[in-house]
């Protein structure tokens, strides 16, 4: 589990570096796109609302308990805000630096496991068929 946590920390650092290295034009467009998105105004991150499939569901299942509790809190708060048709104050919005793709290491690991499983499922031993 420590390797996945270190991978998440590494993704977080590379994400911050990637944001810092954007050109002015790219930064302006990405900032506009991010700030007009509704999910950050109610305190969510992109991976909280990303489209679900089997791989993403498994990645959510493998999250550490603290991260799952944080995500559950963000979703509950966002549901309440959405039901009340309100948004958070500007200071509480999710910032781009905080919107870290925290599921990426888990998704990559699961996809690699599925590829390995498919390889072994389709494996034909040379001893079986001479």
Curated annotation (Swiss-Prot):
GO CC terms, sorted: mitochondrial inner membrane; respiratory chain complex III
Location(s), subcellular: Mitochondrion inner membrane
Disulphide linkage map: none
SUPFAM superfamilies per the UniProt record, alphabetical: 14 kDa protein of cytochrome bc1 complex (Ubiquinol-cytochrome c reductase)
Alphabetic keyword roster: Electron transport, Membrane, Mitochondrion, Mitochondrion inner membrane, Respiratory chain, Transport
Membrane-topology descriptor: Peripheral membrane protein
One of the Pfam families matching this protein, by short name: UCR_14kD
A single GO BP: mitochondrial electron transport, ubiquinol to cytochrome c
Subunit structure: Component of the ubiquinol-cytochrome c oxidoreductase (cytochrome b-c1 complex, complex III, CIII), a multisubunit enzyme composed of 3 respiratory subunits cytochrome b, cytochrome c1 and Rieske protein, 2 core protein subunits, and additional low-molecular weight protein subunits. The complex exists as an obligatory dimer and forms supercomplexes (SCs) in the inner mitochondrial membrane with cytochrome c oxidase (complex IV, CIV).
Family (UniProt): Belongs to the UQCRB/QCR7 family.
Function statement: Component of the ubiquinol-cytochrome c oxidoreductase, a multisubunit transmembrane complex that is part of the mitochondrial electron transport chain which drives oxidative phosphorylation.
Name of the protein: Cytochrome b-c1 complex subunit 7
Species for this entry: Echinococcus multilocularis (Fox tapeworm)
Gene from which the chain derives: UBCRBP
């Amino acid at each position: 589990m420590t390797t996945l946590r270190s991978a998440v920390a590494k993704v977080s650092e590379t994400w911050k570096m990637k944001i810092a290295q954007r050109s002015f034009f790219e930064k302006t467009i990405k900032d506009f796109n991010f700030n007009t998105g509704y999910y950050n105004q109610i305190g969510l991150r992109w991976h909280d609302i990303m489209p679900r499939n089997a791989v993403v569901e498994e990645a959510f299942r493998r999250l550490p308990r603290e991260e799952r509790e944080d995500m559950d809190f963000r979703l509950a708060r966002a549901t309440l805000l959405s039901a009340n048709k309100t948004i958070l104050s500007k200071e509480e919005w999710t910032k781009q630096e905080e919107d870290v793709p925290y599921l990426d290491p888990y998704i990559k690991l699961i996809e690699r496991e599925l590829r390995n499983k498919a390889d072994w499922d389709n494996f034909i031993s040379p001893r079986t068929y001479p």
